UniProtKB/Swiss-Prot annotation:
GO CC entries: cytosol
Gene: ligA
Domain (BRCT) ranges: 605-694
E.C. number: 6.5.1.2
GO biological process, one term: DNA repair
Active-site residues, record numbering mapped to chain: K125
Descriptive protein name: DNA ligase
Lineage of the organism: Bacteria, Bacillati, Actinomycetota, Actinomycetes, Acidothermales
Ligand binding (Zn(2+)): C418, C421, C436, C442
Length: 695
């Protein structure tokens, strides 16, 4: 279970001493499991909470703060099976801040010491294993883990097995005679699931997260095992050196990159608090676009001279701090496993858990994806489990904490019949997906399809919420979604939910009818999305609507004709053919058409200004969401691309643009701000070019 954290500072010195001793013992035990065994039993956030409580007690009772307290030293010690090696310079940890107020207080302390001329280098805090590399005359001679900050583990052979670690630096300019660099070894998120699947197939325990996978892969006794795994290094600091001329950390990064060392392409120098906060906010939103996990942003004073003036404590530099995002991984108790029936009939298991706060919200349910995933992860009812919530993504169970099992846990048995309608379930997709085949009549599937139709990505029917949908289903007014647009005031008056005491329609009934009338005029691509054709999302729907122009043309097209549309392909084409082959699906289209739902694109006589033009959007726009910007480009006849190439005509740049902006500058592609984008949409490319920024 998660460790319990006291919320108040003990009132007496005796109580404080007792709690202090408990915390020291608990923290040191968890530090050993995390840093040495690579098998933590609590999340990073829970560990941070214990450390913060210890710091609060020591601040209130300074006599309890000793040199060997966890707050005063770097955690971790060399494992017995690796030779110990002493770092040339101490390899410190970082102090953490968790709020804007704490960050501002740190900046104020920095400026009090060194003045307001400090610049700050910001970069994502990679969640991996800290390492130290030593180069002599450009040749890699040693690689080590951080250990306790003074002595680490000699893992040179394994470091050399990492694909992007140079064994010899490029001689671009004057190489330092001695160069000690610090970095983070990480495991790419995209490769993590594949690694765990292979471990389970081999009868081995899976890793709980990519950070543990990185640590476990680097600490292999056989370097060939390390070499077989897709580890990567990113360098983020400098230790001892002889002959490095840079005056700033950002300048040093340029030199390191020229010598062949991998440094973060996302590091950015900020000169104001607002710029720092904007950077932190950007990666809070876009952290899951990165190839590696991050748990915050590191902010460093950029000038080396100011770093030296600020100095360090025994544990951390005073010139750097880690801004930690709300935790995305925590541990809690798995109380039960139940199943949910989706709009396409797919039956998905989900975890019912003790409430736990993760990524800024309290969750009690988390997805388990499918029956095979439960077996692969080895999750049992009653387990203490690691739960992850990535931004707005549905929380998921990552895996069990096997070390905390007590024998009372039990296996989950997948149901054989649909819990909503009682129909026998069937396996599809090679046995991975389990579905209820009663698509038309299963109340759970129809309810989910109604929610999908009402969603913003489909027909955007605001008043068709949970209660309204349930009321319509319970009243039997809807045999299927085809009846939705046949609702009338007379029909709604028969449902208590939609009437007032005097029998007149309630406000929500009037609004529902108004919303349905508005939904009839939505563009064709939204109608296609609303029909719940498997695999047809907004991108494919837009492409189909542009190419064919009407439901009838799509229905009559061959699989080959459908598949030839860019963004569609054969899988979606066959899914469309299969959907229209079902009689009651055809009835839905007929009912909606008869009710006045638009089944064809509007005929526009004016030429589209962006015909043949490819546009890429990067960064955050104030006047458009990403989806609405893409829709605007496509409505104007253009192509909205996801990456920059020589074929790109314009790149639209908002706040905090990514690497697409840099590539556009390298290729000499016209770059537009929001005003330029508006001009492009309304007046076309010729007018926009005069407003474009060029390298």
């Amino acid at each position: 279970m998660s460790p319990a954290r006291n919320t108040g500072i003990p009132a007496s010195a005796a109580d404080a001493a007792r709690r202090h001793a408990e915390l020291v013992k608990e923290i040191e035990e968890h530090a050993y499991r995390y840093y040495v065994l690579d098998a933590p039993t609590i999340s990073d956030a829970e560990y941070d909470a214990l450390m913060r409580e210890l710091e609060e007690i020591e601040n209130a009772y300074p006599e309890l703060r000793t040199p060997d307290s966890p707050t005063q030293k770097v955690q971790g010690a060399p494992a017995a099976h690796f030779a110990p090696v002493e770092h040339l310079e101490r390899m410190l940890s970082l102090d953490n801040v968790f709020t804007e107020g704490e960050l501002r207080a740190w900046i104020a302390r920095v400026e009090k010491e060194v003045g307001t001329d400090a610049a700050y280098l910001c970069e994502p805090k990679v969640d991996g294993l800290a390492v130290d590399l030593v180069y002599e005359d450009g040749v890699l001679v040693r690689g080590a883990t951080r250990g306790d900050g003074r002595v680490g583990e000699d893992v040179t052979a394994n470091i050399k097995a990492i694909r992007n670690v140079p064994h010899r630096l490029h001689r671009d300019g004057n190489l330092p005679a001695l160069l000690e660099v610090r970095g983070e070894v990480y495991f790419p998120v995209a490769d993590f699931a594949e690694l765990n699947a292979g471990l389970v197939a081999a009868g081995k325990a899976p890793f709980a997260n990519p950070r543990n996978a990185a640590a476990g892969s680097l600490r292999q006794k056989d370097p060939r095992v390390t070499a077989s795994r897709p580890l990567r290094l990113v360098v983020h600091g400098i230790g001892a050196h002889q002959g490095l001329a840079a005056a700033r950390q950002s300048e040093a990064y340029v030199a390191l990159a020229a010598w062949g060392l991998p440094v973060s392409e996302r590091a950015k120098v900020a000169t104001t608090t607002k710029e720092i906060l904007d950077y932190i906010a950007y990666y809070a939103e876009h952290r899951h676009d990165l190839e590696h996990e991050i748990d915050g942003v590191v902010v460093k004073v950029d000038q080396f001279a100011l770093q030296r003036r600020l100095g360090a404590t025994a544990k951390a530099p005073r010139w750097a701090v880690a801004y930690k995002y709300p935790p995305e991984e925590v541990t809690t108790k798995l109380l039960d496993i139940q199943v949910n029936v989706g709009r396409t009939g797919r039956v998905t298991p989900f975890a019912v858990m003790e409430p736990v706060r993760v990524a800024g919200s309290t969750v009690t349910n988390a997805t388990l994806h499918n029956a095979d995933e439960i077996k692969r992860k080895g999750v049992l009812i009653g387990d203490t489990v690691v739960v992850r919530k990535a931004g707005d993504v549905i929380p998921e169970v990552v895996g069990p904490v096997v070390a905390l099992r007590d024998g009372s846990e039990r296996e989950f048995v997948f149901p054989s019949h649909c819990p909503a309608c009682g129909t026998p379930l069937v396996r599809e997709n090679g046995g991975v997906d389990i579905r209820c085949p009663n698509a038309r009549s299963c109340p759970a599937q129809l309810r989910e399809r109604l929610f999908h139709i009402a969603s913003r990505g489909a027909l955007d029917i605001e008043s068709l919420g949970y209660e309204a949908a349930n009321a319509l289903l319970e009243s039997k007014l809807l045999a299927d979604e085809g009846d939705l647009f046949l609702l009338t005031p007379e029909k709604l008056r028969t449902v208590p939910f939609f009437t007032k005491k005097d029998g007149e329609l309630s406000a929500n009934a009037v609004k529902l009818l108004e919303n349905l009338e508005s939904a009839k005029t939505r563009p064709l691509w939204r109608v296609l999305v609303a029909l719940s054709i498997r695999h047809v999302g907004p991108t494919a729907a837009r492409a189909l609507a542009r190419e064919f122009g009407s439901i009838d043309a799509i229905r009559n097209a061959s699989v080959d004709e459908l598949a030839a549309v860019e963004g569609v392909g054969r899988v979606i084409a066959e899914s469309i053919r299969d959907w229209f082959a079902v009689d009651w699906h055809q009835e839905i289209v007929a009912k909606w058409s008869a009710a006045g739902v638009r089944m064809a694109e509007e005929q526009r006589s004016a030429a589209k200004p962006l015909a043949g033009i490819t546009v890429v959007v990067t960064g955050t726009l104030s006047r458009w969401s990403r989806d609405s910007a893409i829709e605007a480009i496509q409505d104007a006849g253009g192509r909205a691309a996801g990456s920059v190439s020589k074929k790109t005509d314009f790149v639209v740049v908002g706040e905090n643009p990514g690497s697409k902006y840099d590539k556009a500058r390298q290729l000499g592609i016209p770059i537009l701000d929001e005003e330029g984008f508006a001009t492009l949409l309304t007046k076309g490319p010729d007018a926009a070019r005069s407003m474009a920024q060029r390298p």
